[in-house]
From Swiss-Prot:
List of residues binding [4Fe-4S] cluster 1: 68, 73, 79, 308
Cofactor: [4Fe-4S] cluster
The organism's taxonomic lineage, starting at the top: Bacteria, Pseudomonadati, Pseudomonadota, Gammaproteobacteria, Alteromonadales
Name of protein: Lipoyl synthase
Keywords recorded for this protein, A-Z: 4Fe-4S, Cytoplasm, Iron, Iron-sulfur, Metal-binding, S-adenosyl-L-methionine, Transferase
Amino acid sequence: MNRPERLQPGVKLRDADKVARIPVKIMPSERETMLRKPDWLRVKLPASNQRITEIKQALRSNGLHSVCEEASCPNLAECFNHGTATFMILGAICTRRCPFCDVAHGRPLKPDADEPVKLAKTIRDMKLKYVVITSVDRDDLRDGGAQHFADCIREIRALNPHIQIETLVPDFRGRIDVALDILSTNPPDVFNHNLETAPAHYRKARPGANYQWSLDLLKRFKERHPNIPTKSGLMMGLGETNEEIIQVLKDLRAHDVNMLTLGQYLQPSKFHLPVERYVSPQEFDELKVIAEDLGFSHAACGPLVRSSYHADLQAQGKEVK
């Protein structure tokens, strides 16, 4: 068996080059076998692109990244036009290679020590009141990137004292306690970590991750910060059943998670995992009722819902779908 070529620092691997490095073989999807996208997934583009252009220019001029662009989010136009963005720190190259995700895999560069200040200034200039900070996985760092998260939160609050900050963190594999110790110095207003799918589908969808580790991360943060909401998100369409998703919801509540996002998986390219089903808006509505009955303080459930989609409205308890 031929070994993959050694990764070069800063080189992005995408699509076929990325998924070739996972343990489950994925055959490229043929157009005739791909499920037809239903009408309810058609995204309406805004009348004006001015605000979108302004946000993209602000990101470029400061050398910053948004997960909206890097992960090819279908809501990019709506969110940018609304004046919101989810900032992705620690670079745009992930040490993991999840085949549902469009973020590039590779060997990341050293973290930018100036990024926390640049991020804080950009948020101030954009006059944002609620921000979501996420990152790629950084298994190459001894703390998984936790100190960089804490530094960003500190600098953002220094320049934006009235802002609310939500962090969407990786799983800090093997470093949970170290990471939580560091994050305790500057905790966010909402702590988010996505389980993504049911445990039976982790090997194909989240190679390198562990379902129980992710639950433990959410639980341990809540134990340290009982008054800070915890949140998690799931995708549907990766081969799971509704019954499996309901069990995940029960597991999340058993680990004291307060907020939920549930959305439709969309295949970024023919080289990624195929969509195995499109879940109807009615099914999402039914799952929302179940989530609320289980005790989630807020559940955003709908085909185009993503973990940071209208996160400010989610935090206010307003309906998002």
